[in-house]
């Protein structure tokens, strides 16, 4: 047999029907659902008198528009209707739901892995582009639209065009203070927001091997920001250890059997990717976005670029739009940019590793008077664990707000909004115009960088924190 | 689904790169549980000023583009979120065809599922179209069967389209109904899965 990449292996294992000159019909192992992109799909089933084919492969939670304070009081009537619709749909069609009363509730991409629903080798879909997160386990996971949600609900399959394969290799050792978020931002900064279009990414190299599962999820999460629907990391002992003994993970002999299968999920020597790119991990700095898409990103110790630095006319035009929207001027030092808001949360950075990194930075310090800072744990389970470790107290004593789990200020569908013209250091994934509120200015950073910005009121190179520590 | 064989309409140009789905339909309009009625919210933050009046600076608000049903957009159109509300909003606004040098994958797929045709066009050909249609009130015909765009001024340009989606659009097939015919194949596949996946 020809050597194959892990991407091709998982793909081939899931072909129900090979389409000659057509897309393949792929089997879907896990379908995750939330309140925003599913109501129209369930309505479609109802209209046609169709059923959910495999409720046991389907799991729902609510995350996008729920409040993070007084979570049971959804004041927005339209949002409330959406939450009620999910409850009704899950009950009518027999789908498991982790609602606001459940200890399993949280951001869909945080709870899937926590509950052991996300496992290596699975095909996983959800009506949400950040489904790529689950690729961290060596699963083929991608976002779909609502029509496809309906298709999966009724058939447990999807017609998909075989993707091209792209290797993103990062070797070396990260500097102290440089995190998974900085790695993925550096990749997107170098290659742009569409280099992954039409591809599935496999992240390879020492840097990813040395990451925790939380960190791998951060990387895979932002594959979509590079244009790739999916990005994955081949599973290893770190993955197996994480999956063991989770609520829905197979147990005992079944687990051992699964691990044996998972061990084969790696790219064969000699397999060829359609494209490969390589980055030196030693040279990656803490990153800060300055513009209106995640590709407009720079090391914290640099300056906002000048329009002349863009060779393509379209890029220059976009940069000029970005200065205006972001209220920045060319050559302004990134470290001089002041922020009024700090948001630590989202499916990119709201897990234990993220909260621990942020808490490390702020222990015994105070949030600057000019800053409002909030921490939104990714799930109820993260919230409880963080409280057990006393992280909530570290945040609260520093002046952060400690909230209930949800998507919150990543897309500001609930009341967690950044006011017009104000600036936010955010650990989320998109700095698009209006993403955190109309006219809100978003700078994407790692949890450690966000925490430092909260303390100082402006961006600070987190590497300085470690230098100071060494001197003392 | 309504079959789409050929479409004639006015073309409008939105020459910006990386137009994301947050711009096409901002999140405050994703709370509804209906599939229709999103057209009035399309490009909301660009389209209206602080007083809710049409923003004269926004390209699609130009009088020459009113009533357009073909959108000539920039590179990487529809990037970002998977929200199908984006094609729903464009469709409801009146756009049936979108022509761009490149599209984001999920958005591209979502268009087909709604009977809309996204056409990927080589950059130079696209640039030529922009030149012909920018700031003008001009009709074009997009003939999907012949894979040809032409207008009354004698301009003609061919385009590529995935044969699978061409067939689906021309016949207006319902994808789920077709897949349900493969029930036996799906059952057969399910019977061969590893036991740990059956749980």
UniProtKB/Swiss-Prot annotation, chain A:
PANTHER family: 3-ISOPROPYLMALATE DEHYDRATASE (PTHR43822:SF9), HOMOACONITASE, MITOCHONDRIAL-RELATED (PTHR43822). Binds 1 [4Fe-4S] cluster per subunit. This is 3-isopropylmalate dehydratase large subunit. Pathway: Amino-acid biosynthesis; L-leucine biosynthesis; L-leucine from 3-methyl-2-oxobutanoate: step 2/4. GO terms for biological process: L-leucine biosynthetic process. SUPFAM superfamilies: Aconitase iron-sulfur domain. [4Fe-4S] cluster binds at residues 347, 407, 410. Catalyzes the isomerization between 2-isopropylmalate and 3-isopropylmalate, via the formation of 2-isopropylmaleate. Keywords: 4Fe-4S, Amino-acid biosynthesis, Branched-chain amino acid biosynthesis, Iron, Iron-sulfur, Leucine biosynthesis, Lyase, Metal-binding. The keyword Iron applies.
């Amino acid at each position: 047999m020809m050597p194959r990449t892990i991407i091709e292996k998982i793909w081939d294992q899931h072909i129900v029907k090979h389409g000659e000159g057509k897309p393949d019909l792929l089997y879907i192992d896990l379908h995750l659902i939330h309140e925003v992109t599913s109501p129209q799909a369930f309505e479609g089933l109802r209209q046609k008198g169709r059923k959910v084919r495999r409720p046991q492969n389907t799991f729902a939670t609510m995350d996008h528009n729920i409040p993070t304070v007084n979570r049971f009081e959804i004041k927005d009537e339209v949002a409330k209707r959406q939450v009620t619709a999910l409850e009704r749909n899950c009950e009518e069609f027999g789908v498991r739901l982790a609602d606001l009363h459940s200890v399993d509730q949280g951001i869909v991409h945080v709870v899937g892995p926590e509950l052991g629903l996300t496992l290596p080798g699975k095909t996983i879909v959800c009506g949400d582009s950040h489904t790529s997160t689950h690729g961290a386990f060596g699963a083929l996971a991608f976002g779909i639209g609502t029509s496809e949600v309906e298709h999966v609900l009724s058939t447990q399959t999807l017609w998909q065009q075989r993707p091209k394969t792209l290797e993103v290799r990062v070797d070396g050792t990260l500097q102290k203070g440089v995190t998974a978020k900085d790695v993925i931002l550096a990749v997107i900064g170098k290659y742009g927001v569409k280099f992954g279009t039409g591809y599935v990414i496999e992240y390879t190299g020492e840097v990813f091997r040395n990451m925790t599962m939380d960190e791998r999820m951060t990387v895979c999460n932002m594959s979509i920001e590079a244009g790739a629907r999916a990005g994955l990391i081949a599973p290893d002992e770190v993955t197996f250890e994480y999956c063991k003994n989770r609520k829905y993970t197979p147990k005992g002999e079944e687990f051992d059997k699964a691990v044996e299968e998972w061990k084969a999920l790696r790219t064969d020597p000699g397999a060829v990717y359609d494209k490969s790119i390589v980055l030196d991990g030693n040279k990656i700095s803490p990153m800060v976005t300055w513009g209106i898409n995640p590709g407009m990103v720079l090391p914290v110790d640099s300056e906002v670029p000048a329009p002349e630095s863009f060779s393509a006319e379209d890029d220059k035009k976009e940069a000029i739009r970005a200065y205006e929207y972001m209220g920045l001027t060319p050559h302004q030092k990134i470290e001089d940019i002041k922020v009024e808001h700090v948001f630590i949360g989202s499916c990119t950075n709201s897990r234990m590793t993220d909260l621990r990194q942020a808490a490390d930075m702020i222990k015994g310090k105070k949030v600057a008077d000019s800053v409002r800072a909030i921490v939104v744990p990714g799930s109820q389970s993260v919230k409880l664990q963080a409280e057990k470790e006393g992280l909530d107290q570290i945040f609260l004593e520093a002046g952060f707000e400690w909230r209930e789990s949800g998507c919150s200020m990543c897309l500001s569908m609930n009341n967690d909004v950044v006011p017009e013209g104000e600036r936010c250091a955010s650990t989320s994934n998109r700095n698009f115009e209006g993403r955190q509120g109309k006219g809100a200015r978003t700078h994407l950073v790692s949890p450690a960088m966000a925490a430092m910005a909260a303390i100082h009121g402006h961006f600070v190179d987190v590497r300085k924190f470690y230098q100071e520590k060494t001197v003392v | 689904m309504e079959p789409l064989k050929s479409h004639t309409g006015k073309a409008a140009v939105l020459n910006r790169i990386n137009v994301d789905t947050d711009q096409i339909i901002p999140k405050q309009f994703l709370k509804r549980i209906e599939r229709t009625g999103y057209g009035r919210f399309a490009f909301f933050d660009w389209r209206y000023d602080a007083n809710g009046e049409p923003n004269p600076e926004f390209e699609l608000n130009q009088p020459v583009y009113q009533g357009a049903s073909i959108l000539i957009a920039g590179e990487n159109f529809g990037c970002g979120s998977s929200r199908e509300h984006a094609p729903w909003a464009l469709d409801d606004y009146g756009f049936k065809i979108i022509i761009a040098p490149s599209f984001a994958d999920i958005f591209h797929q979502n268009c087909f599922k709604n009977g809309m045709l996204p056409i990927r066009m080589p950059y130079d050909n696209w640039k030529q179209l922009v030149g012909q249609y920018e700031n003008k009130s001009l009709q074009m015909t997009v003939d999907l069967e012949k894979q040809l765009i032409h207008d009354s001024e004698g301009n003609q340009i061919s385009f590529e389209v995935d044969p699978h989606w061409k067939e689906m659009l021309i016949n207006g097939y319902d994808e789920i109904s077709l897949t349900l015919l493969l029930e036996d194949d799906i059952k057969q596949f399910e019977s061969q899965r590893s036991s740990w996946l059956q749980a």
